[in-house]
């Protein structure tokens, strides 16, 4: 089977870190000669630190993979993962849509690769100083989950401060946009997918809902009644279910061994449910950290998510859905998409929010709700409002959609960057 061009746009993956380095010590050549175990490639990679606050020794670590073909003419994509506090390099670059996936001690090709707001803006400004040849490129800011805060807030700041970036659009997947609606949609998802009983659904909606539980847990004031409800929900769902994709198996030692064999055979149609374990092992290798020009300061090991950087958890409750409206009114294209097997931020809440925003903005439906295709199969459903605000689902996809549905995610994202409608009929030719 032939595959599409490997990396179709340059992608920056950025993660906030705390460093005790001087500017001189991190301003050297960031070019990555080669990552340990990687296959031969025809594109350049860079990794290093961009200081955003010299006084407090704060920096963003980035990994940048150029487009494989004609990199000088391809758009630039900034990808931010959520959490808060989770790694865009570990999750986005190595588990989802970066150029490689780890497999044991080596890296294998990913054929469906996608090659606090003020801090992110400072990062972009300084990154463009380091890479001035990219400043005129079309820029798209993208992310998932809690990046439903980071991404629109960064785009809003670029517009408000009239920063001269060529910002064209934002895309956010399974995003946290409104605390109550997003979190309370879990109950319906659990019940409709057979994960909880009728009586537990009733308790989870009328006695104590998930937004109440989350709010109380954050403030450490969980009441006995809410504690009983969430224990019952957890008991029925089972801890052996992956809530980020309820159809996906969990990683077990025997599966990990099998996954490494399959990956080395480059069976790219298989989902490696143990990719996080393999990524964790790979990124904790000293030779890999040296190749990335990375330095662990204040922590013993790299982890997917960390609380070393402190986040105000109350910010979870700050709604960002109306920021999307401001961006759309400013002419910035907005795509909100949902992996339809995610129970953490289910599509039902997201669809309700986007539909409500379109009504609030007075946007007419320009593409009625319909199926879209990836190759010969239905890949999801989509609706477009005013040719500026789009909602789409990715069929069979997880919270991290490119992880479980890389091909469909690539079709969605490529169409959005090109300003094209999602394919509305089956293609008999696979690329």
Question: What are the roles of these predicted feature ranges?
Answer:
Residues 2-431:
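Terminal and linker regions of secretory-pathway proteins
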């Amino acid at each position: 089977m032939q595959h599409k061009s490997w990396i179709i746009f340059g992608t920056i993956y950025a993660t906030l870190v705390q460093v005790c380095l001087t500017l001189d010590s991190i301003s050297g050549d960031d070019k990555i000669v080669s990552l340990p175990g990687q296959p031969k490639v025809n594109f350049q990679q860079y990794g290093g630190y961009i200081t955003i606050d010299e006084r407090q020794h704060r920096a963003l670590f980035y990994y940048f993979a150029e487009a494989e073909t004609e990199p000088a003419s391809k758009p630039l994509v900034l990808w931010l993962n959520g959490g808060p506090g989770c790694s865009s390099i570990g999750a986005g670059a190595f588990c989802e849509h970066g150029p490689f996936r780890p497999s044991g001690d080596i890296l294998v090709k990913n054929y469906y690769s996608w090659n606090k707001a003020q801090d992110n803006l400072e990062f972009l400004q300084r990154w463009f100083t380091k890479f001035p040849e990219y400043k005129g490129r079309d820029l798209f800011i993208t992310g998932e989950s809690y990046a439903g805060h980071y991404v629109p807030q960064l785009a809003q700041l670029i517009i408000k401060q009239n920063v001269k970036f060529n910002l064209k659009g934002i895309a956010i997947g399974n995003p946290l946009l409104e605390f109550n609606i997003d979190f309370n949609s879990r109950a319906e998802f659990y019940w409709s997918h057979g994960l909880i009983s009728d009586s537990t659904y009733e308790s989870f909606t009328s006695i104590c809902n998930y937004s109440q539980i989350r709010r109380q847990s954050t403030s450490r004031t969980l009441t006995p009644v809410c504690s009983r409800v969430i224990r019952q929900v957890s008991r029925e769902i089972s801890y052996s279910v992956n809530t980020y994709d309820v159809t996906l198996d969990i990683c077990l030692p025997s599966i990990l061994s099998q996954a490494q064999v399959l990956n080395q055979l480059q069976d790219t149609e298989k989902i490696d449910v143990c990719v996080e374990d393999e990524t964790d092992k790979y990124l904790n290798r000293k030779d890999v950290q040296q190749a990335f020009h990375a330095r662990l300061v204040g922590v013993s090991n790299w982890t997917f998510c960390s609380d070393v950087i402190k986040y105000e958890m109350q910010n979870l409750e700050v709604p960002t859905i109306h920021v999307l409206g401001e961006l759309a009114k400013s002419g910035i294209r907005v795509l909100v998409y949902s992996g339809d097997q995610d129970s953490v931020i289910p599509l039902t809440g997201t669809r309700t929010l986007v539909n409500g925003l379109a009504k609030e903005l007075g946007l007419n439906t320009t593409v009625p709700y319909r199926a879209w295709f990836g190759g010969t199969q239905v890949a999801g459903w989509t609706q477009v409002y005013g040719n500026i605000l789009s909602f789409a689902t990715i069929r069979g996809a997880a919270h991290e959609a490119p992880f479980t549905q890389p091909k469909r995610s690539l079709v969605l994202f490529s169409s959005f960057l090109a300003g094209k409608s999602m394919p509305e009929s089956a293609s008999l030719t696979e690329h």
